[in-house]
Amino acid sequence: PAPLAPLAFILRMRTVPLRNLGACIAPDNSWLFLQGIETLPLRMEKHCANSLAVAEHLEKHPDVEWVRYPGLKNDPYHELNQKYLHGKGGSMVVFGIKGGAAAGKKFIEALQLFSHLANVGDAKSLAIHPATTTHSQLNEEQQRGAGITPELIRLSVGLEDPADLLEDIDQALAAAK
């Protein structure tokens, strides 16, 4: 109908560009964003060093089935990591805990320093059990198709002292038995 045409046009002009381009960022937020960009290389050095320490520690731990981190020499993506990331494996470490989903849930609940959050790349260390959180709406077959297994734990390693991170992981692995 003709009377609704202007309203439809107005709504389209407000929603489509917002969806495609995003909202304008506030000046204060822009300043904070720029401050973060300035220190990003320093933070990434610490993220990568901490992640490698965590991955190497987990690789030797008796309660861990497997570890995936491109900074490890035996990781299937190690060569690509060397080529494209100059040997810096990033801050994500994924591992399989012995005991499956039940152990994974206990591990997450026992962590004290790591936060139980789904976002990644924070200055704080984060941990999640994807099978019971981010991918819980999928059945087991769909989860496996997405690369999510019952024992999988995903860590986003932050900037804390590596000794503190390893201590928290060790106590949580002990509690998960």
Predicted segments, located by residue:
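Active-site C-terminal subdomain of aminotransferase-like
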Residues: P1-M92, G96-I108, L113-K124
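PLP-dependent enzyme catalytic core of the Aspartate aminotransferase-like
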Residues: R43, A102, E109, S125-K177
